[in-house]
A protein has these predicted regions:
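Non-catalytic RNA-recognition surface used by pseudouridine synthases
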Residues: 2-389
């Protein structure tokens, strides 16, 4: 009974195929594609050949739909292999961009002969390239989060390569003054990446960002790195203790399986605990900073007056940003030590994001050190002693 049903289905396919082949020259791939879902065949090419032989149809000179694109599949697979040669990957995704004329001819025939539920020519081309490429590379198709995505553009005869972004976590300490945290963007592309900056978005490497980027460029062969910093410091500040945490997003790296050292010395900075993570946390990450400040005053300050700084301990500090939005920061502990008649040290532990110099000078911060002491104050320097969770 089952065999009889299969024969009936096959007879119907033969009947439906005849008028199509009478009007259009189709290759075995395109012919088999129209009917494979009605059969138990696994190969569209074999089904197309069987249909052609069953009705004694002549071999096509050139396929009306695809212009024999499948005859050149080895050429395009070679293009994919060459394009992906320097990349590390185990999972892949293949995409294709066909000429509009091909998809229009495919749509025309499917509409004309009411061929519903049929895979498009784009789907079949993509699938055939996937089969051949994975057979050679032993890669696994992953439609959700592939290591590498290869897109063949049949209009330009070019293979575009993109890899999955990598995310890293690390910390840095800074032992010398005069090094900015952030690097100035390339003046030609404003940080987007261009030929002049080798798509890095930066040209120089004389900052924390630049020095960390240089390490990541070399190890992962990535072009662009985007950083998320847990707080910031002044150019003249030291970063001590266990270091300042940061997150890095690597755009389209060629290497992903990289051995990362626990500690890496890069001139004025040391990178600690660099490791891969699944993603960068969203939103603001709460943290506290232990900071030592050297403060100078316009007027002489007495030890008795400095005692008033203890009023700042534990109270909310209101910080108003450029948009007029108010933020609350807490001073969790505060100690001071007089250095001279017009200078003193403050060691405080505060919520991350407290603008230290503004907190000293009183610019859009209330209360502030200058307000408590009732004299003009300036922060000569401050160092980050520790970043705390």
């Amino acid at each position: 009974m089952q065999n009889h049903s299969l024969l009936q289905k096959y007879d119907k396919i033969i009947t439906e195929s005849k008028p199509i082949l009478e009007q259009y020259d189709l290759c075995d791939y395109c012919l088999g594609r129209f009917f494979i879902k009605k059969t138990s065949f696994l190969s569209v090419k074999k089904l197309g050949r069987k249909i052609r032989n069953s009705i004694n149809a002549k071999d096509t000179v050139q396929c009306y739909i695809c212009k024999d694109i499948f005859s050149f599949s080895d050429f395009y697979v070679k293009m994919m292999l060459d394009a992906s040669d320097k990349y590390q990957f185990s999972t892949i995704l293949v995409g294709t961009i066909l000429k509009q004329s091909i998809t229009e001819r495919d749509d025309k025939i499917r509409s004309e002969f009411c061929l519903r539920g049929v895979d498009s020519i784009k789907t079949l081309v993509t699938r055939e390239l996937e089969k051949k490429f994975t057979k050679i590379t032993h890669g696994v198709i992953d439609h959700l989060s592939p290591d590498i995505t290869l897109t063949i553009n049949f209009k330009t005869e070019h293979c575009d390569v993109k890899t999955r972004h990598l995310f890293l976590y690390g910390r840095y300490t800074k032992s010398k003054r005069g090094l900015s945290q952030k690097q100035k963007s390339c003046e030609d592309c404003y940080g987007r990446g261009c030929l002049f900056c080798d798509n890095h978005g930066i040209v120089s490497f004389d900052s924390v960002e630049g020095k960390v980027s240089k390490v990541l460029y070399k190890k992962f062969q990535t072009e662009h790195v985007k950083f998320t910093w847990m707080g910031g410091e002044d150019k003249e500040s030291l970063v001590l203790g266990n270091g300042r945490p940061f997150f890095a997003k690597l755009i389209s790296p060629k290497k992903s399986d990289v051995l990362l050292p626990k500690k890496s010395h890069q001139d004025e900075i040391v990178i600690h605990d660099l490791r891969k993570i699944d993603h960068i946390p969203k939103g603001t990450i709460p943290f506290k900073s232990k900071i030592t400040l050297l403060i100078e005053t316009k007027n002489k300050i007495t030890s008795e007056k400095l005692k008033e700084l203890k009023h700042l301990d534990g109270i909310p500090i209101i910080v108003t940003d450029e948009r007029g939005i108010r933020h609350k920061k807490i001073i969790h502990s505060l100690k001071y030590k007089k250095e001279s008649a017009r200078s003193f040290f403050v060691i405080l532990e505060a919520d991350g994001g407290l603008p230290i110099k503004r907190f000293v000078e009183g610019t859009s911060v209330d209360p502030s050190i200058c307000k408590i002491l009732d004299t003009e104050c300036s922060c000569r320097q401050f160092d980050i002693d520790q970043i705390l969770p």
